[in-house]
């Protein structure tokens, strides 16, 4: 079995970090890298003590100021990839500094990294257990639900700090933006987009002192994480809005040109202008959705055919539903169309995600 580097980012860690590192060493995990992410001066003694523990290859990488967990991980990944004996390692396992990840579970992930050289390994907790703090249970349930809704992926523990990174995929994660806790969320999204496999491994769920040692800011970091999670849908809205504006402008310009230079009148010129404008705006919308919203890099012809099939079905559904609702209610056609098309707009997002731009 190859070596594994245990990476522990730490900010003002508890003293039990010393015993935790000793336990890792006692269980054969000899290569350990700690990142002191700008801890206060009174915590320096803890890092110095850990660095002097015998019978291991322990290094402490220090930040002059707190740069965030995302930056700590990226700097450590970069250090790992520059090791002269990199070929001796199967990869990296990250663990939290508060000791909430059992040594047995760290070993479990190390083995999974060895056996799955092209997958991200997640050590996943059970949030239905009684010992889980309510705020942690609620936060993870919401985040996991958002991933299922907006990405069509079921990740049971999106915020786990116990992760395994095979050497072959680590370089990819250096390009991901994010300096704090949102970086770990972006990792998962990146894996979805680049079709990097994710394997979940069940680990023991441990919380000390109601998770009071965490440096996770429930307001600031939650906002960043949810902003990242909702990013594709927000881009989808922006794509649709810009395409709508282009459709109106194209219709106006084409209509003016046909009236000025063509011998066409009445409904015919409106129909032709509408068709040409819709071809322009829908092509633009397809490009934006493929390139920026869903970041789909596979068969363009196949996805284009699916996209226009969806457009036709969506148009027919709109006409049928508006007609039916109008027939049996007293509401105006325009008001009904706004409601119906808004619902179809939301439905279209999920159809595009799960069918038009579905990854293998």
Protein language model regions, located:
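Cell-envelope/extracellular polymer assembly enzymes that use nucleotide-activated donors
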Residues: 3-5, 31, 186
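Short, well-formed alpha-helical segments that are part of the catalytic scaffolds
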Residues: 12-26
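A conserved acidic beta->alpha catalytic loop
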Residues: 36-47, 65, 99
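Conserved donor nucleotide-binding strand/loop of the catalytic core
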Residues: 47-87, 91
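Acceptor/aglycone-binding surface of glycosyltransferases and processive sugar-polymer synthases
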Residues: 65, 71-80, 89, 103-181, ...
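Catalytic donor-sugar/metal-binding loop of nucleotide-sugar-dependent glycosyltransferases
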Residues: 154, 176-179, 188-206
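Active-site donor/metal-binding and catalytic loop motifs
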Residues: 199-217, 295
